[in-house]
UniProtKB/Swiss-Prot annotation:
Recorded superkingdom: Bacteria
Record organism: Kribbella flavida (strain DSM 17836 / JCM 10339 / NBRC 14399)
Oligomer and partners: Homodimer.
EC number(s) from the headed UniProt entry: 2.4.1.250
Listed name of the protein: D-inositol 3-phosphate glycosyltransferase
Functional summary from the UniProt entry: Catalyzes the transfer of a N-acetyl-glucosamine moiety to 1D-myo-inositol 3-phosphate to produce 1D-myo-inositol 2-acetamido-2-deoxy-glucopyranoside 3-phosphate in the mycothiol biosynthesis pathway.
Gene: mshA
Pfam families in UniProt: Glyco_trans_4_4, Glycos_transf_1
Transferase listed as a keyword: yes
Residues bound to 1D-myo-inositol 3-phosphate: 20, 31-36, 89, 122, 146, 166
Lineage of producing organism: Bacteria, Bacillati, Actinomycetota, Actinomycetes, Propionibacteriales
One term of GO molecular function: acetylglucosaminyltransferase activity
Similarity annotation: Belongs to the glycosyltransferase group 1 family. MshA subfamily.
An annotated GO BP: mycothiol biosynthetic process
Reaction catalysed by this enzyme: 1D-myo-inositol 3-phosphate + UDP-N-acetyl-alpha-D-glucosamine = 1D-myo-inositol 2-acetamido-2-deoxy-alpha-D-glucopyranoside 3-phosphate + UDP + H(+)
UniProt keywords, alphabetically: Glycosyltransferase, Magnesium, Metal-binding, Transferase
Length: 424
């Protein structure tokens, strides 16, 4: 076993573990979402601070090289573990041993003490992190991103509960990790009350937003770029197409708005931007059928996920961005939209209550009632004065969530974990 790191040795390298989703994947497709953005942006900012980062992820194609330089100082290591394609997230636990063995081999060829800290993301990665922690004798810092007990307590009608294996796996990681990073105060509270985490091990580190990419701009130009008329009322959803994210609620709320104000039809655009979760169909047929059944298929667009500059255009083009999720550990979409100067209507759940300031940068809706969301969307989208006031406040609010601060706070947590282990 490697000797524990000396307390006065500077941090040099981090082993970042993101087993089930690659930082190279396009967010909004498959299982790629906010966690992908988090891992990429945090790693980039850590590299800016002089910390080298290796990101270990499961290879999903034989064509992928063993390693890819994301940016100078950040290397993605594609680990072969199980079939390259066709595995759902629920089938990945069977590949944990194979993946962990490959991660341990990667360190074994290095000089002793090559990595100073392990940072795992999501419970599957946490299980691998536990094995690496014991072998390498370096601290394990873990970020949950989502928690099964929280998700199971607020399932959408057509969603399925998380399996017992995940519940047990999360409990094991929470108990053994040296440091637990929570996105918000609420998540920190849930770690303590639902999982029995030691409060002293839990630290709140807010995610960030890329304030260079997601910034205010000319709405008319943005609308030309995405192909909507300048006087349109644009309601946008951004994210994976899955019950948890509830894009159907936006479609239903838009239909309700048109029932009440049919004169809006000529100007209304409902943009659902994202792809099906997991190995779903390329086109979200069920949601397209819902739009047809509700009579709003003529105003509804399904837009494939896209790189960030194009996404920023959609945020700027939108009158309001809707985030109706049943559960969110934070809600990066809400923050990105606000950084672009667009108010947000969101469900009053989880981290969205931190990401959105109710009544100031947008509206938080208790529950998931169609009428309530229709009311909130109409209150902002059809009132230019409200949109302008909230949009300005949204930009100011988002300025406090840069990734640079996230990286600095995370690095401090790494140092605390390292010093604590060295002192034991």
């Amino acid at each position: 076993m490697t000797e524990p790191p000396a307390v006065d040795r500077p941090l040099r390298r981090v082993a970042m573990i993101s087993l089930h989703t690659s930082p190279l994947d396009q967010p909004g497709t498959g299982d790629a979402g906010g966690m992908n953005v988090y891992v990429v942006e945090l790693s980039r900012r850590l590299a800016d601070l002089g910390i080298a980062v290796d990101i270990f992820t499961r290879a999903t194609s034989s064509a992928l090289p063993a390693k890819v330089e994301l940016v100078p100082g950040v290397t993605v290591r594609n680990v072969a573990a199980g079939p390259y394609e066709g595995l759902s997230k629920n089938e990945l636990p069977a590949q944990l041993c194979t993946f962990a063995r490959a991660v341990l081999r990667a360190e074994a060829i290095r000089e002793p003490g090559y990595y100073d800290v392990i940072h795992s993301h999501y419970w599957l990665s946490g299980q691998v992190g536990l094995l690496a922690r014991d072998r390498w004798a370096v601290p394990l810092v873990h970020t949950m991103h989502t928690m099964a007990k929280v998700k199971n307590a607020s399932l959408a009608d057509d969603d399925v509960p998380e399996p017992p294996a995940r519940l047990l796996g999360e409990e094991q990681v929470v108990e053994a990790a040296d440091r637990l990073l929570a996105n918000t105060d609420e998540e920190a509270h849930e770690l303590v009350t639902l999982y029995g985490a030691q409060p002293a091990k839990v630290e709140v580190v807010n995610p960030g937003v890329d304030l260079e990419v997601f910034a205010p701009g000319d709405q008319a130009a943005a609308r030309r770029a995405v192909g909507v008329r300048e006087d349109a009322i644009v309601l946008a959803f951004v994210g994976r197409i899955q019950p948890l994210k509830a894009p159907d609620l936006l479609i239903r709320a838009a239909a309700r708005m048109l029932e009440r104000q049919p004169e809006l039809r000529d100007r209304l655009v409902v943009a659902v931007i994202g792809g099906p979760s997991g190995n779903g169909m390329e086109h979200p047929e069920a949601h397209a059928e819902l739009a047809r059944r509700l009579g709003v298929d003529d105003v509804t667009r399904f837009v494939k996920p896209m790189p960030r500059p194009g996404l920023a255009d959609w945020y700027r083009a939108a009158s309001v961005v809707c985030v109706p999720s049943y559960s969110e550990s934070f809600g990066l979409v809400a923050l990105e939209a606000q950084a672009c100067g667009t108010p947000v209507v969101a469900a009053a759940v989880g981290g969205l209550t931190t990401a959105v300031t109710d009544g100031v940068t947008g509206l938080l809706v208790p529950g998931h009632g169609v009428d309530d969301f229709a009311d909130a969307l109409a209150a902002i989208a059809t009132d230019p004065g409200t949109r302008e006031t909230m949009g300005k406040a949204a930009v100011e609010h988002a300025q406090g969530f840069g990734w640079e601060l996230t990286a600095q706070t995370t690095l401090a947590a790494y140092r605390t974990a390292t010093e604590t282990m060295a002192a034991e």
